Amino acid sequence: MKKYDIKTTDKETLRKWFYLMTLGRAIDEKAPSYLLQSLGWSYHAPYAGHDGIQLAMGQVFDKDTDFLFPYYRDMLTVLSAGMTAEEIILNGISKATDLTSGGRHMSNHFSKMEWHIENVSSATATHDLHAAGVARAMVYYGQKGVAITSHGESAASEGYVYEAINGASNERLPVIFVFQDNGYGISVPKKDQTANRKVADNFSGFKNLRIIHCNGKDVFDSMNAMTEAKEYAIANRTPVIVQANCVRIGSHSNSDKHTLYRDENELTYVKSADPLYKFHRMLIRYGRFTEEELKEIADLAAKDLKAANRKAMAAPDPDPSTVKDYVLPEPYQPQKYKEGVQNEEGEKETLVTAINKTLKAEFRHNPDTFIWGQDVANKEKGGVFNITKGMQQEFGIERVFNAPIAEDYIVGTANGMCRFDPKIHVVIEGAEFADYFWPAVEQYVECTHEYWRSNGQFTPNITLRLASGGYIGGGLYHSQTIEGALTSLPGARIVYPSFADDAAGLLRTSMRSKGFTLYL
């Protein structure tokens, strides 16, 4: 049964929706003027044509129970979710009081992390992995909510989107993947992306996955789809894909000129399909509002935008001297052996035994510690080198478990899980050997700049463990040392113990420190 329609939806709800859609469109249309005046908003991706689904995503989002991962076109989504026009403009013109990053991140990347509107990368759809990770934490800690992640249909060509959906369906995670399908990836038409007309159909064979199609241009169809998706995901603890059919009325962004690849007939059609125009006409045709009433709402939106712009323009600019702030949080300060030297007393242990014992000790110390990766939890086998032997037996499958052979998923879901609560610390076996880690470098990069990009609001507490530089003479794929390729990226601590006592001490410090550590 459909919950929302033009005849029965109460008037105050319709009034709120029309106000949000009108205000959002006014901001969207004003954004390019800031760049023309050299005031900022150097990157702007207009959302016009996606109005229905973006309004719906924001309306079903609950900041107390849900997590929202918007992409760079989701201006109306975050406005509908509760962000103000002023907060959106502060991001667009990169002010010091920008909630997303204090002016560090690209414009048109909106977040409010205290509300769980997450700070995401510009590398489109990488946040699908983070949504799966935070949903895993929601399940473990018993929070009845959903993670909503959004992007265009072309981003579904990325391998990590497949990894996220595959993992979410396998783990039965309450994630809503929203594909805003406008038919283009910049200038690349959908037919050059996939053979299916509806991209979500590429995933139709997945178990534990619901797929809902809706008209993303229509407010009511989108509201019904998102409401159904959320209710289903929570009730069944399974992921849902919502494929929303949209149009892109303008160019991809302010650096694109769509008249170079779209003909006049297409441009005429997308303008005629304008969701705001159609919603306006529908409200009048069904007698829910008069023209005068809608004009009053539009005038109020214009007035509010003017006030928001005035406040945002008066906000301070970022201080250039702070550019090196928030590269890495301060590490945990050890209580014993502060000089890194201790007396050799007691029985000597191998490096493997020292790591295994330290992992177990830290898991007892902090019940909010987790480990997963390849081959970490199979009966008596605890990884290729038995590093995690006995851990699942002692700490349970909820805290110690295997991951698919999907290195990006291993790292990305660790990032996401840490977003649920800063007390969470995650150890991951990033790959069988360091030599096989390269597919995860995309998420490694994400982890290195989360702290800086969020202006210190979030850092993934991850210890990424890799077996590196093996002495077995394994050649190209079992004996590589990879630290040289990764040390050029700020935002990660890299440790490489050579003795058992170093291995134990550095692992303990890594697991108690805030931030991202590569442990080789």
Regions found by a protein language model. Give the residues of each.
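Short coil/turn connectors at secondary-structure junctions
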Residues: L14-F18, L39-W41, D62-F67, T84-I89, ...
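Short acidic, glycine/serine/threonine-rich loops at helix termini
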Residues: L79-T84, G159-E163, S187-D192, N224, ...
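Cofactor-binding active-site loop characterized by glycine-rich and histidine/acidic residues
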Residues: E29-L173, P189-K207, L476-Y477
